[in-house]
């Protein structure tokens, strides 16, 4: 960890705890800052705040009192999930207090070079693929960021022989100033998190912050399957390295079933350890990064062939009497489910879909679900999903919850079929998050096997 003194004896407010806020508070305290933590959860229900208080860090819980900002803070570090419309943040900005996320802190102290990965879909899988390939090549890829390990925590233990492989959300990237990865990846850009950003253009601008400090000596890996992303290529100082499954590019690309990097075959597409056209894109992004880091083709091929996926992202769960179960609970939008289905023969798929009703119809999904063996539909959005199934001519049954849906899907499947949980909806109508939903699917599959 780099020892820096820019926060020494400076008053810093950490707004919001969770993993990233807790890590930021401890780091700032270690760097000599005078830290105050403010979290909305009551103290008695807030183990993180209790621990920080025991460590001598000032905590204010149970709300966000605006008068707290009457103190002269030099900096605010906010939890990424707290929107900039929050009154505390608005007041801080009005007073000229810089507002950062802990990703910026991680950059400032990191001795390790940083590879940053952002995008709408595929971030976690691509981040994990890159980390595993670099580690296999002896470059020790340390996963951090939005993938579940606070970047500022991992940066404290990283040496210059490691590589920080950071998954970065738009929320995190809104709060960076000096952040400067040596390689950045944008997997794709789709309209999402508009409730947070207000406009798609604002969401894209937040993602684009990843390259703000990059120079021609740095590499920006972009998905040229998308015209929007391709158009952005002319707006960066970084050296652009494209990847595409649709055209031959000066980077990583798919041609005749083979994955190439600048004219050289790296591996066959069907050798990737996880199915789906989206995973071909993820693999191409990984290949581009790996080749920029001088990883040999054999190491890339062996690692991506053995790659088992990421939990809740088209994760193979089990095989029961010839029926394979896949957990794709992370597919919380139509595009993600479309990509999941692209990896299978529809006639052998029983799809479990439905969840939180956000008011959108599923007409875009009709071509992708046409020809499915059956569907099991559940959740608030069930009526809308059923309308799409009717248009596609797919028979369906309804379920009360994930356990019920999994059992019914298994009853409808026969040897050689696939039961695919890929809801195309968020989980919040029934479950706290997509992880809980996916875990219940996994647990039910285990019960069916007993």
Curated annotation (Swiss-Prot):
It is found in: Cytoplasm. Pathway: Cell wall biogenesis; peptidoglycan biosynthesis. Its EC number is 6.3.2.9. SUPFAM superfamilies: MurCD N-terminal domain, MurD-like peptide ligases, catalytic domain, MurD-like peptide ligases, peptide-binding domain. It holds the Pfam family Mur_ligase_M. Keywords: ATP-binding, Cell cycle, Cell division, Cell shape, Cell wall biogenesis/degradation, Cytoplasm, Ligase, Nucleotide-binding, Peptidoglycan synthesis. The keyword DNA damage does not apply. GO terms for molecular function: ATP binding; UDP-N-acetylmuramoylalanine-D-glutamate ligase activity. GO terms for cellular component: cytoplasm. It catalyses: UDP-N-acetyl-alpha-D-muramoyl-L-alanine + D-glutamate + ATP = UDP-N-acetyl-alpha-D-muramoyl-L-alanyl-D-glutamate + ADP + phosphate + H(+). InterPro entries: Mur-like_cat_sf, Mur_ligase_C, Mur_ligase_C_dom_sf, Mur_ligase_cen, MurD. It comes from the Bacteria. GO terms for biological process: cell division; cell wall organization; peptidoglycan biosynthetic process; regulation of cell shape. ATP binds at residues 119-125. Cell wall formation. Catalyzes the addition of glutamate to the nucleotide precursor UDP-N-acetylmuramoyl-L-alanine (UMA). Belongs to the MurCDEF family. PANTHER family: UDP-N-ACETYLMURAMOYLALANINE--D-GLUTAMATE LIGASE. This is UDP-N-acetylmuramoylalanine--D-glutamate ligase. It comes from Streptococcus pneumoniae (strain JJA).
């Amino acid at each position: 960890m780099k020892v820096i003194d820019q926060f020494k004896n400076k008053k810093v407010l950490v707004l919001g705890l969770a993993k990233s806020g807790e890590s930021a508070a401890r780091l700032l305290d270690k760097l000599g800052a005078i830290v105050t933590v403010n979290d909305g959860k009551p103290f008695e229900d807030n183990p993180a705040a209790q621990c920080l208080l025991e460590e001598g860090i000032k905590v204010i819980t149970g709300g966000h009192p605006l008068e707290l900002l009457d103190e002269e803070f030099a900096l605010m570090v906010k939890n990424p999930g707290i929107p900039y419309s929050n009154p505390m943040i608005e007041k801080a900005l009005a007073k000229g207090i810089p507002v950062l996320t802990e990703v910026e802190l991680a950059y400032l102290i990191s001795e390790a070079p940083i590879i940053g990965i952002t995008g709408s879909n595929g971030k976690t899988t691509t981040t994990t693929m890159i980390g595993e390939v670099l580690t296999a090549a002896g470059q020790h890829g340390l996963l951090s960021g939005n993938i579940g390990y606070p970047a500022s925590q991992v940066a404290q233990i990283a040496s210059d022989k490691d590589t920080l492989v950071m998954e970065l959300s738009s929320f995190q990237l809104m709060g960076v100033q000096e952040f400067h990865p040596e390689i950045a990846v944008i997997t794709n850009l789709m309209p999402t998190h508009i409730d947070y950003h207000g406009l798609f253009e604002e969401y894209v601008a937040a993602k684009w912050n990843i390259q703000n400090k990059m120079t021609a000596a740095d590499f920006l890996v972009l998905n040229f399957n998308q015209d929007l992303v391709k158009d952005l290529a002319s707006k960066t100082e970084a050296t652009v390295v494209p990847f595409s499954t649709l055209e031959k590019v000066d980077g990583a690309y798919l041609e005749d079933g083979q994955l190439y990097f600048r004219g050289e075959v790296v591996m066959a597409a069907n050798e990737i350890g996880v199915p789906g056209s989206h995973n071909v894109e993820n693999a191409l992004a990984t290949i581009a990064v790996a080749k920029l880091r001088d990883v040999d083709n054999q190491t890339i091929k062996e690692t991506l062939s053995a790659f088992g996926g990421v939990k809740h992202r088209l994760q193979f769960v089990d095989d029961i009497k010839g029926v394979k179960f896949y957990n794709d609970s992370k597919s919380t939008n139509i595009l993600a489910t479309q990509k999941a289905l692209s990896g299978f023969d529809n006639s052998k798929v029983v799809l479990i879909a439905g969840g939180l009703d956000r008011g959108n119809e599923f007409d875009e999904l009709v071509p992708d679900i046409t020809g499915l063996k059956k569907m099991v539909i559940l959740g608030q959005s069930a009526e809308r999903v059923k309308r799409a199934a009717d248009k596609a001519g797919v028979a369906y049954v309804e379920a009360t919850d994930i356990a019920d849906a999994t059992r019914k899907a298994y009853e409808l499947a026969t040897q050689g079929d696939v039961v695919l949980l890929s809801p195309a909806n968020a989980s919040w109508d029934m479950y706290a998050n997509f992880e809980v939903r996916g875990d219940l699917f996994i647990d039910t599959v285990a019960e069916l096997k007993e």
